[in-house]
Regions:
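Active-site/ligand-binding loops adjacent to catalytic centers
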Residues: 1-62, 106-127
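Phosphate-binding loop/pocket of nucleotide- and phosphate-handling active sites
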Residues: 72-127
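Glycine-rich beta-alpha junction loops
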Residues: 18, 22-24, 47, 67-69, ...
Length: 127
């Protein structure tokens, strides 16, 4: 809504916590972006899922998709070449993944099953 500068009647996203077509803090968000020399952009659900998986895989952080959206924006900005050395970037992750377990269940890999045998366990984990 803010990026398009219009109210969105029926927003669609897997990030349910930010599925708001008319944000109550619209002016505050725009002011914060302006005062910090920042900007507000949008990301796709695919970009959110990429960041969501990366947080879990690389950092061990289980964030909800709405929180991962901020990192998705950083990744998008980086890939577009809009970040330069020395830039200060803040990505806030406030929501725990347990707020939205359905998305985690949909994208996680099936558990690995092995026999109750130390050699089978070593083989499964690659040691």
């Amino acid at each position: 809504a803010i990026v398009q500068n219009r109210v969105i009647e029926n927003p669609q996203t897997l990030a349910t916590a930010i599925k708001i077509g008319n944000p109550a803090s619209w002016k505050l968000a725009v002011n914060a972006a302006n005062e910090s020399n920042g900007f507000i952009d949008c990301v796709t659900d695919d970009e959110i899922l990429e960041a969501y998986k990366m947080l879990t895989r690389e950092e061990g952080v289980f964030a909800e998709p709405a929180s991962a959206a901020s990192l998705a924006g950083v990744i998008k900005t980086y890939k577009a070449g809009k970040l330069k050395k020395g830039d200060v970037v803040v990505s806030v992750l406030t929501g725990n993944g347990l707020k939205d377990p359905d998305n985690a269940i949909k994208i996680c890999n099936a558990p690995i099953k092995v026999d109750n045998n130390i050699e089978e366990i070593r083989k499964a984990i690659g040691i």
